[in-house]
């Protein structure tokens, strides 16, 4: 596995740190609620994504191969949820005085990982590419899960900090509204990549 660590790390860096549903929602939460109130969301993404990769690794990938409709259903359900989330973000009533819209909880974010089309696709690709059956199966599996865990931490912290940094410019309601619209549009743009 050692020669593939660099390739796996690069793959996880690009897929984890590029804009996607988790990162956009994390940035939005960092912007509107700050770092401390976003910690449950961050932990939900980190542990949910890692758990999902482990579950795909230890059997779900075979279920997807036998019954592709399950994967398609997950992607469709995740798409519907993203549209709902984009709507909620876009039309949230937030002002510089009072930031309503409660932060996303640990459980909500943890459970969303199993509906997150980008995350499911990343899990399937990483497991099918970097985990081999045989004597080293467990070793390869632990490497993939460990690298995914590390990059989930790096990515989510980075995006929350971007949101927090942007909040310094939120001196009026118009800026906040524009930021929320931008986050909504980015979230909706993620959907197109699920069907390419």
Locate the predicted segments by residue.
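Hydrophobic/aromatic residues within the transmembrane alpha-helices of Major Facilitator Superfamily
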Residues: 13, 17, 50-51, 87, ...
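Select subsegments of transmembrane alpha-helices in polytopic membrane proteins
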Residues: 44-48, 110-121, 180-183
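Flexible cytoplasmic inter-helical loops of multi-pass small-molecule transporters
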Residues: 91-104
